Amino acid sequence: MGAIHEETANRSPIPDGHQGAGDRAADHRHSARRAGRWPAPGGVCHFAGADQGGGVAGGQSRMGSSRGTAPRGLRASDGGTAGASSVHRQEVGSRRQEETGTQVMKTLVTAIQKGGQGKTFATCHLAFDFLERGLRVAVIDLDTQGNASFTLSAYQSGYLASQLFTGDTDDLRYWFGKREGESLALIAADANLANLDKMELSQAAAALRASVAALGEFFDVCLIDTAPSLGVAMTAAVLTADYMLSPIEMEAYSLQGMKKMVAVISNLRKQNPKLRFLGMVPNKVDARKPRHVNNLATLQQAYPQLILPFSIGARDSIAEALGEQMPVWKIKKTAARKATQEVRALADYVFTKMEIAQ
């Protein structure tokens, strides 16, 4: 079977050689194929420093951005991360683009070995936000629960996730070549994903890499949502991705899941050296609960270089938005405003770290 042996993964140390977050500017070159398709952003503005102690990033959110148009600018974080210990140093999302003269599609996977952490929330909201920036976005749902497929059902491409592992890349190119005008395309989860654990990991990873490479001819960004188990699908996705993001709740079981995931990342980066871990996103944080505050402090102490400099609060408006198949900034309630600021801050952070050209 293709899954990584958990005991072996957990013995792997985190690699040294941290590169400071945000120390490289994005490369805003266009390829000839993509030039002129979308308007470039009008400028760059900054959002205020974030509260590392479980609070919310400050600054104004982009309320009212219209779908399908690039906003006037994007906000780049002015905050750094705390110094990393020698044990837990990890390069955090600071990757120089290849000097090829073209802008290649960037691929991000959301993954953690624990369910209910917010992977689907992050995937869907990044997709909605990137769409508003004028990017062409492909979303791959590799979780048989299909929650991302539900929220993004209005953007069905008709191509199924299992076909990325079993189909022909020429067929994939033909399929999306006919639908090239679509700016957001969902590659939905299907029942056949359950059969992937019967595949050899090397075969599954090679097939997914080839399919994602073919998707790169039609999209600027590919976002992959994964199941919480370290099976063939998640492992193949991590071996394919350029970047990885791990939402995490502030509960004891979640912290255990993150410890496993950090070890797995170290192991898989040996096979996928281009992978950059953007960090852990503290999610569903309730500052009124002492255990959440204490667990966040524990995470920050254990992995100071890997915790994002802001958190997402425990807000019902986010769950409501996912159920209503829309981003939280479309929820017309006062309670959704704070959630909007937090989610926009996350999207800005990820966008900047992925060095996506517009």
Swiss-Prot record:
Q: Which GO terms describe its biological process?
A: DNA replication
Where along the chain is composition biased (Basic and acidic residues)?
88-99
Could you tell me which InterPro entries the record lists for this protein? AAA_dom (IPR025669), DNA_Partitioning_ATPase (IPR050678), P-loop_NTPase (IPR027417)
Taxonomically, which superkingdom?
Answer: Bacteria
Region (Disordered) location: 1-101
Q: What does this protein do?
A: This is one of the proteins encoded by the trfB operon; it is involved in plasmid maintenance and replication.
Q: Which family does it belong to?
A: Belongs to the ParA family.
Q: Any idea what this protein is called?
A: Protein IncC
Organism, by scientific name, is: Escherichia coli
Instruction: Identify the gene encoding this protein.
Output: incC
